[in-house]
Amino acid sequence: RIPAGSAVLVRTGWGRYWPDRARYLGTAKPGDVAGLRFPGIGVEAAKVLAARGVRAVGIDTASIDYGRSKDFIAHRTLYAENIYGLENLANLEKLPPRGATLIALPMKIAGGSGAPVRVVALLP
């Protein structure tokens, strides 16, 4: 069971491809949106997480939605419930399955809908 108020971090293993842009993103060509290929979460997973009252969803890929998404339904589903997303997370394999305290420190950007963020996990 996922307790309400949790941050759920999705470890796809995709972080192992960083910093190789071609492997991490599916393409090394800037602006090649059609070439993007990486995993993300689906709308059903986003709905389940929202229903369980999570506060945040993080992932070790470039986006919460899969690479070729055109509608960004996972983003929209989570953000409609005021659940924030954390992308491009590193070292998820070093975290325990539960019990870590997550601290996300975003850069302040006036009027922005997103920002670079430093994420720190305190281990139990």
Regions from the PLM with identified roles:
Residues R1-P124:
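Active-/binding-site microenvironments in catalytic and ligand-binding cores
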